[in-house]
């Protein structure tokens, strides 16, 4: 029960990221427009008082502000798409449901335009409809309902005379019906909920503000590993607290109030639940990265230095902390707990200093400049001394604890000598033992990248033993273990199944072959290899691929390809080395010895070959642009979690991989070069 609820909360948290991702663009427009209209910047740049520039600035402010004015409908659309696997039909259903619910509530409560003049009554003008103000929560509820309707009815069958309305066309019809029904209990219940939220936020924010901001920062940071922090901070940013703007409209939520106050150029009273991120993300975590680098073993410092520098810059500039936090979260939970405490104390410190800073994306330098320095409405410079103190604290604490407890942070891992001592033929036996033996295996499966095993007792699984046997990573989801052994995963699974059935009794009978992928590839005359797009679509960074095995580069480096037409082509001249039995992945080797894995979609192994048609055979020579696989893209979008297709270099070694700055691509477009 708990695991199911936890999984649903994770899905909701992930769905909230889509509408939240729009806010930085809106904030950028609003911040620049407001800054150009403000006296603080005009004092130093008098030429921006020019009428044309001021008109453009005014339009930018309006363009950014309209997004924040319509957050409820944006959240409704975004949550619907996020929970429905990206299908646009869910967004249409959400829009239909949103306007029907609001119109029905307004009519049921007999809300008139005159009543909108008193915002304390809880009414608002929503898309021109006088109705009950349900805010972002109302949008989230409608989005979740639209996604439920989509997932429930998208493939419904109807009698032939109603065939036009079958399938996805039925979803908006059901949404119209359910949202009409929902409006009545919402009209009755929501005022009580709103009064409760107001009472809670007033008591929390006005009576115990210091404790509230500390607990907010502390809990939000602790929830990041579970992906639930988006759910936690949403009420604080979009509902808790209220402020009346110049037009008499009640604005709710710390972030919305902050943006509205920046837009109107008034004294700031908001930002309590955002500003604590700046000292941590701009100063504290980069200092922690330095401590991790300096405590790495000498032979690993070059690699660790590159990783830590990249993660530290990402944290400093954008406020994205996960690449750095996940480098020590699992190996040193104590460090992460201390990090969470320091995060909460940062919120408390800036609150006590009476600062009012905010952001639209995260607490990085970019938001600090746009929404702190340029508006110049609060003593933003105090963040710098606080941040410098935090840098010292983070560096000293992290360095001391890493050395004291010998935490295996990046670059301090023990060498896995047992890898060399395990022959390929014995590997299936050893992996079975590491999984807890035959009796502990409930379900056994594999795809081209990983061994998927559902176990009876997770405590019997030797995770470190699996890594020592060559797994580049081990993921745990409940009692489901995923050990990343790369292309030989299916061979291991096949032999493990035969061992469990008694068909194999000794290592000499296994089929796993010796892995020679780590042997250096001799590139005698060819200095570099160009790799072209495997089809028509667009490119995303590997870090955005919705599968940790790929996004954390456990299989190797590369890119994510999002196909827009139903076909995969050869990215270079070479040979087909592997075609997985379910046809969802293909391995290639270039004429220069570069090995590439093209994994079509995420979790598509579960489709058992449906939607794929192989056009080549193993060991067949291919030329760049030659069709390799025909795919039913519509089927994949409907039945797979994602159609994002990782293109991975599996034998990069010490060679350098550079990426072309491209977005939309076709088979003739180069996407990366290895040399």
Swiss-Prot record:
Residues 547-651 form the PTS EIIA type-1 domain. One of its GO terms (molecular function) is protein-phosphocysteine-sugar phosphotransferase activity. It catalyses: N(pros)-phospho-L-histidyl-[protein] + D-glucose(out) = D-glucose 6-phosphate(in) + L-histidyl-[protein]. GO terms for cellular component: plasma membrane. PROSITE patterns: PTS_EIIA_TYPE_1, PTS_EIIA_TYPE_1_HIS, PTS_EIIB_TYPE_1, PTS_EIIB_TYPE_1_CYS, PTS_EIIC_TYPE_1. Residues 425-506 form the PTS EIIB type-1 domain. The phosphoenolpyruvate-dependent sugar phosphotransferase system (sugar PTS), a major carbohydrate active transport system, catalyzes the phosphorylation of incoming sugar substrates concomitantly with their translocation across the cell membrane. This system is involved in glucose transport. PANTHER family: CYTOCHROME C-TYPE SYNTHESIS PROTEIN AND PTS TRANSMEMBRANE COMPONENT, PTS SYSTEM GLUCOSE-SPECIFIC EIICB COMPONENT-RELATED. This is PTS system glucose-specific EIICBA component. It comes from Staphylococcus haemolyticus (strain JCSC1435). The lineage of its organism: Bacteria, Bacillati, Bacillota, Bacilli, Bacillales. The gene is ptsG.
